[in-house]
Amino acid sequence: MSLDINQLVLHQLIKRDEQTLEVVLRDSLLDIEPVVQEMVEELHRVYSAKSKAYGLFNEESELAQALRLQRQGEEEFLGFSRAATVRLKDELAKYPFAEGGTVLFCHYRYLAVEYLLIAVLNSCNSMWVNDSLDVSSTRYLDIPHADIIARIDLTEWETSPDSLRYLTFLKGRVGRKVSDFFMDFLGAQEGLNTKVQNKGLLQAVDDFCEASDMNKQERQTCREQVYSYCNEQLQSGEEIALTELAQELPPLGDQNFAQFTEEKGYELAETFPADRSTLRQLMKYSGSGGGLTVNFDAKLLGERIFWDPATDTLTIKGTPPNLRDQLQRRVSEK
C-alpha cells in the first residue's frame, strides 16, 4: 500500500467517573516504525471500506482555523493536536454517554492526496497464549469497530475550498449521538448527500426512459445498464460520473443522458459516490412491514408478479421451491 505517514501522534481521554473526563497528552510525535505503519494502514483500510457522510467546515470552525495555521507553518503538528484534543474533551464532556479512548491524529499521503485523519479508538480486553503456553490478558485497539472517525482531504480543502465533500465522517451507531459531538468538535456541517444524489439519479433514469418512449423491455435494459456501470464504479472504489454513464445509454435525440439531467434541473453533481442500497432499487423491489417481507427482481413485475393498485394486492405466480415446501407442510398439518 502506497501510504506515507508524515506525522502521527496519540493522546488519551480517560473517564475517571460519571462526571470526570481526564485528558493525557503526549509530548512528542510517534516514530514511524513498522508496527505504527501497519496500524495506520489498517485504519485506512477499515475507514475506506465503510459508508461515509460528506461535509465541510463552518466558517467559525476553531479546528479549521487552527489547522490552517498549522498548514501555514505557524504552529507545529504536535501543538495543534494537543489543543484539539483538549477541545474534544470539552465537547465530549457535554454528553452523558461520554467515554474515554485513544485520540489519533495522523497526517499522511495516499495516492498523491494528503489527508488528516482524526479518530477516537476504543481499547478491548482479550487473551493470548505465550510461547510457554500460558494464558495472559492483553489490550488492543479495536480498529475494525471504530466509529468516531473523520478524514479531511487536505489537498481538496486547499485547492477547492468551496467543495462540499473534502471532509468525510462516519455517522456512528444507531441510538448514539456520536456524530453530533464529533461534528461540533470539527465545526463542520453535512455537505454532499450521497443518498439524495443517488435517488435523484434513479428518478432521472426513470424520466429519461419515459421521455425516450421506451417499452417495458427497453426500460429494464436501460436500468440494467445503469446498475452495471454504477456497480462497477462502486466495486472499484470510483465515483459515478454522469458523462461516463451517458456513454452507456442511448441518446434522446441530439441529447445524451448527462445533458438531459442538466436541462431538467436534477441538481446532480458531475461525479458522486455510489450508494449501494439506493442503486439496488434499479434491479429489485423490496419492502417489509406488518410481519411481511417482500423482495423480488424488478424484471418479474408483470411476468410472474402482478400488482393491482386499486386493491393493493400483489399476486405471485410460481413460488420458490423452499417456500412452497414450507407451505405444503403447514397445510398438511391441518
Curated annotation (Swiss-Prot):
Pfam families attached to this UniProt entry: NA37 (PF04245)
Keywords, alphabetical: Cytoplasm
Lineage: Bacteria, Pseudomonadati, Pseudomonadota, Gammaproteobacteria, Enterobacterales
Keyword Oxidoreductase: no
Organism of this sequence: Proteus mirabilis (strain HI4320)
UniProt xrefs under PANTHER family: NUCLEOID-ASSOCIATED PROTEIN YEJK (PTHR38772:SF1), PTHR38772
One MF term in the entry's GO annotations: single-stranded RNA binding
One GO CC annotation: bacterial nucleoid
Name by which UniProt lists this protein: Nucleoid-associated protein PMI0825
Protein family: Belongs to the YejK family.
Localization (cell): Cytoplasm, Nucleoid
